[in-house]
Amino acid sequence: MLGSLKSRLTNLEGQSTWIAAGVGGFVLFLLGAVLLGIHWSQPPEQRGVDDILAKTGPVDSGATIGNPTVSTLIFITQTLLEKPGGYLSNDVTPPGLWLDNMPNWEFGALVQARDLARALRKDLSRSQSQSTEDADLVVAEPALNYDSSKWFPSAESSYYKASNSLNSYQIRLAMPEEGAQLYARADNLRNYLADVETRLGSLSQRLSASVGQARFNTDLAGDPAATQSTIGVSERVIKTPWFEIDDVFYEARGSAWALLHILRAIERDFGSVLENKNARVSLKQVIRELEATQQTVWSPMILNGSGFGVFANHSLVMASYIARAHAAISDLRALLAQG
């Protein structure tokens, strides 16, 4: 009987050892996943136009009109794919599966990349409305519009395809016999900035709705003959759900990060146009407002205090910078429209 008791105690000790090892391993896994998630959630650093050209452009590419803009688009795409942790929006395993700040940041940057790719295909690479689309941009633009959350076939493979096509277009820009062009004209720039203006306006409204706003319906304002599909209410309260506040914040942060790089490149490519319209300072003001959105967030979480409350409201601060950039874009488009 004594031997049987010893045997049972030995078995229990063995089981306890295995349980302790399992619990310890799980705790170490969680700790490692948390630390890795924190590292992966750090936004990429800003880069200057010359640094981007040195990384992604051909030799002496800065001398060719269009290379700064195309190099920046390639840089944004490659950053999404090659930053620490890689592309996270379609991850199906921890720790990427548990993260949401960086995937929202990625989506904001991706939207700006898509808008620029569409502008390149639709306007910037074409001299007239009936001119032929560039073959490489025909591939790149839809490739960037592939579903960002798809795991199979992976979004990464489609975005790498877009990057390769953009690289081919960029090389051809410096080869006159290849027929690739980027036309730095005021009307082309105005068309692109119109898309930027609507994107920033939407982000500003979504950020401002973090505290809830009572808004009058101005959908048909200014046109007495205008109609819409369904009858809208005259006034409504718009408020971003509490669990989506940080999502909107980081989407705006990623969008602003990508856009400020694009506008720096546009300042280089469209320098003569901006000087002719006396609009360079206006563009610099937009860039400065966007740079302010990239300041370090010292709080461990995005706070949502009331407008004049005790606690900060990070969304309203971000909305302020985005709204000023939006207003400056509107002024810039007006300057470009002048003769």
Please describe what each predicted stretch is:
Residues 159-287, 294:
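Extended amphipathic alpha-helical interaction segments
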Residues 119-133, 153, 175, 205, ...:
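Short, solvent-exposed secondary-structure capping/transition elements
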Residues 91-101, 150, 236-246, 299-317:
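A cross-kingdom feature marking solvent-exposed beta-strand/loop segments within repeated
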Residues 136-173, 282-307:
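Long, amphipathic, charge-rich alpha-helical segments that form helical bundles/coiled-coils
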Residues 1-22:
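N-terminal positive-inside, membrane-proximal cytosolic segments immediately preceding the first
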Residues 21-35:
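Hydrophobic membrane-insertion alpha-helices, especially the h-region
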